[in-house]
């Protein structure tokens, strides 16, 4: 179940998260702002309870058994993001409509293979385009389909549920241990809900006491007694119990443990209903960071009732990792290229050599791209741009066509957006290289005209000139001559009056 590739991912994640501690306030990891969490309460001003267990909250989802090597997303999205979003919205996580799909995130970042990932990668997706609920992206029975969801409304719903940022807490001593417990209890604000935190460790060769009967306020029977030596894994800390007693290797007794939740289901023999006690001692004693990361990861969620600007895209394609998307605008209606152009952070040469919806699935995909973060740069009458880059990335070069490109502008009326449509995109081939599609928010001016007879009975141009009114309201004089019907050529002479005068010589 575990392998050295995942171990490397875990160690790299630990390194990245630890690097974030060198800055006292913020750190950008993978393009997502990370905050070193600081309690709003005065240091030591709170009396913490003896125990906290947020896994018993209605906001925490039922324990589940992860699919494949998806542990990082199972923790960061399936548990942490789900709990925090439901705590924010005061919702019950027992129903699929309120649980967030870790597989939706994992399938976007695993390159079409059963491989591990970083916790922040799923949160980066949550930050940019939101996370689907399990109602829109149901649980899978196999890790090998690598499914992508299709449907504009599903993606539009996902855009409501975002990660604003995520937080780091590093455990190094008793003071930072108190800080973690405070976060779990009420995040430093009296009367507020506590949080949960993701962490990484190894998980091959660990040892447990599965019949713990010592002091406890929370009542679980499983205590970790020895750290693992291989196989990186991600899990979630949901609470603590200060009464737990743990016999250290030197025979001394240490008190207190975190409550950890795993994603191996409720019947995993080393745990108690999917949970185990993780003694504080392991964090504050000397150990290898690959065995257990001292850095814990939390999420600050954001609910967006209505987006501002959303692109709707539909296409058929047979090897999805060939494709990369950009979306942009120009506020100059005479522009021939985007003034502002941004790389879309998902569907970015990802997903492996499969059809758009996954292995053995349909080639068609319809999705939404949230442009709201760039709305402040968008004027009232822009040109909208969609760029599709097609390059061979895997073992085969796919092929396909565009179906839909539309822009939904919710800025004036969130309930009734203005919809701009590309009217002739359906069926256009996605060529190798750069494919640019544009929609003007202003209809081109309409020009009316009357038919004229410009050939005489001999089928030659009439010698006299004609005066036309041009599309800009000015005038031009035109004469036709030297018409060659067989070769399809004609000579045209014209004089344009830029001052609008009809006095044309």
Question: What would you call each of these model-derived segments?
Answer:
Residues 57-68, 109-113:
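A short glycine/serine-rich beta->alpha loop
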Residues 92-111, 143-144:
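Acidic helix-start/capping segments at beta-turn-to-alpha-helix junctions
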Residues 73, 77-81, 108-257, 261, ...:
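Predominantly the structural core of cysteine protease catalytic domains
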Residues 2-11:
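Sec-dependent signal peptide recognition
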Residues 439-505:
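Surface-exposed, beta-sheet-biased, low-hydrophobicity segments with strongly acidic/polar composition
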Residues 64-89:
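Alpha-helical support elements that line or immediately flank enzyme active sites
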Residues 20-55, 310, 403-409, 424, ...:
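N-terminal zymogen propeptides
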Residues 14-15, 19:
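N-terminal signal peptide c-region/cleavage motif recognized by signal peptidases
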């Amino acid at each position: 179940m575990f392998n050295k590739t995942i171990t490397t991912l875990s160690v790299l994640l630990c390194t990245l998260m630890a690097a974030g501690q060198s800055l006292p306030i913020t750190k950008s990891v993978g393009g997502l702002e990370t905050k070193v969490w600081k309690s709003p309460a005065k240091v030591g001003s709170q009396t913490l309870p003896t125990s906290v267990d947020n896994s018993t909250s209605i906001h925490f989802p039922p324990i589940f058994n992860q699919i494949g090597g998806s542990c990082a997303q199972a923790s960061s999205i399936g548990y942490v993001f789900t709990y925090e979003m439901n705590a924010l919205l005061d919702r019950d996580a027992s129903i699929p409509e309120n649980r967030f799909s870790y597989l939706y995130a994992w399938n976007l970042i695993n390159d079409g293979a059963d491989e591990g990932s970083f916790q922040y990668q799923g949160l980066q997706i949550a930050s940019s385009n939101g996370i689907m609920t399990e109602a829109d992206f149901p649980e899978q029975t196999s890790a090998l389909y690598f499914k992508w969801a299709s449907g504009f409304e599903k993606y539009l719903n996902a855009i409501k549920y975002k990660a604003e940022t995520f937080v780091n807490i590093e455990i190094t001593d008793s003071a930072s241990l108190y800080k973690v417990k405070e976060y779990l209890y009420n995040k430093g604000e009296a009367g507020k809900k506590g949080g949960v935190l993701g962490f990484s460790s190894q998980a091959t060769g660990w040892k447990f006491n599965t019949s713990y009967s010592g002091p406890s306020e929370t009542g679980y029977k499983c205590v970790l007694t020895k750290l693992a030596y291989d196989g990186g894994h991600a899990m979630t800390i949901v609470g603590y119990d200060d009464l737990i007693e743990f016999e250290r290797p030197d025979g001394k007794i240490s008190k207190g443990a975190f409550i950890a939740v795993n994603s191996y289901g409720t019947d995993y023999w080393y745990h108690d209903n999917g949970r185990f006690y993780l003694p504080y001692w392991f964090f504050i004693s000397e150990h290898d960071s690959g065995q257990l990361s001292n850095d814990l990861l939390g999420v600050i969620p954001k609910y967006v009732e209505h987006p501002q600007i959303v692109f709707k895209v539909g296409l058929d394609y047979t090897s999805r990792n060939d494709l990369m998307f950009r979306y942009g605008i120009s506020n100059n209606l005479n522009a021939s290229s985007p003034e502002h152009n941004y790389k879309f952070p998902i569907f970015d040469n990802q997903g492996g050599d499969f059809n758009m919806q996954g292995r053995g699935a349909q080639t068609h995909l319809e999705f939404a791209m949230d442009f709201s973060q760039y709305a402040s740069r968008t004027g009232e009458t822009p040109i909208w741009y969609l760029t599709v880059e097609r390059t061979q990335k895997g073992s085969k070069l796919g092929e396909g066509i565009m179906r839909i490109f539309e822009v939904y502008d919710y800025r004036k009326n969130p309930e009734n957006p203005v919809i701009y449509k590309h009217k002739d995109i359906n069926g256009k081939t996605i060529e190798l290289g750069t494919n640019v599609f544009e929609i003007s928010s202003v209809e081109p001016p309409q020009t009316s005209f009357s038919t004229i007879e410009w050939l005489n009975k001999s089928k030659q141009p009439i010698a006299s000139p004609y005066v036309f009114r041009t599309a800009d309201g000015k005038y031009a004089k035109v004469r036709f001559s030297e018409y060659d019907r067989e070769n399809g050529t004609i000579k045209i002479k014209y004089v344009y009056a830029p001052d609008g005068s009809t006095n044309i010589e």
